[in-house]
């Protein structure tokens, strides 16, 4: 047995499910809108990575915030999901 650490690949759906279960706040980067980020908590998702985001806040490049509440974000618009 070697002393190497083996890395395990986690499918994206499993990662999103973990964020959902742990009620982890997330930051979502949008496709083709690089100056806007969405922050909130994931409340649900489907196999197309459409996401229901609770307590959503839109944050722009100048750190201006706009509260959106509960939103449905289409999976095609998501570039990156990051725990915050």
Swiss-Prot record:
Similarity remark: Belongs to the snRNP Sm proteins family.
GO MF annotations in UniProt: RNA binding
Main location: cytoplasm
InterPro entries: LSM_dom_sf (IPR010920), Sm (IPR047575), Sm_dom_euk/arc (IPR001163), snRNP-E (IPR027078)
Protein location: Cytoplasm; Nucleus
GO cellular component: cytosol; nucleus; pICln-Sm protein complex; post-mRNA release spliceosomal complex; precatalytic spliceosome; U1 snRNP; U2 snRNP; U2-type prespliceosome
Pfam families in the cross-refs: LSM (PF01423)
GO biological process: mRNA 5'-splice site recognition; mRNA cis splicing, via spliceosome; spliceosomal snRNP assembly
Gene expressing this chain: sme1
Xref: SUPFAM superfamilies: Sm-like ribonucleoproteins
Protein's UniProt name: Small nuclear ribonucleoprotein E
Keyword Nucleus: yes
Domain Sm span(s) in chain numbering: 13-84
Keyword annotations from UniProtKB, A to Z: Cytoplasm, mRNA processing, mRNA splicing, Nucleus, Ribonucleoprotein, RNA-binding, Spliceosome
Function of the molecule: Involved in pre-mRNA splicing. Binds and is required for the stability of snRNA U1, U2, U4 and U5 which contain a highly conserved structural motif called the Sm binding site. Involved in cap modification.
PANTHER family: SMALL NUCLEAR RIBONUCLEOPROTEIN E
Native source species: Schizosaccharomyces pombe (strain 972 / ATCC 24843) (Fission yeast)
The protein's assembly and partners: Component of the Sm core complex, present in spliceosomal snRNP U1, U2, U4/U6 and U5. The core complex contains smb1, smd1, smd2, smd3, sme1, smf1 and smg1 (Sm proteins B, D1, D2, D3, E, F and G, respectively), and is probably a heptameric ring structure.
């Amino acid at each position: 047995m070697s002393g190497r650490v083996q890395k395990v690949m986690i499918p994206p759906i499993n990662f999103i499910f973990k964020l959902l279960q742990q009620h982890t706040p997330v930051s979502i980067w949008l496709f083709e809108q690089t100056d806007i980020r969405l922050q909130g908590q994931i409340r649900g998702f489907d196999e197309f990575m459409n996401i229901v985001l609770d307590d959503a806040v839109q944050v722009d490049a100048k750190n201006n915030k706009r509260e959106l509440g509960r939103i449905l974000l289409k999976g095609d618009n998501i570039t990156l999901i990051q725990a915050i």
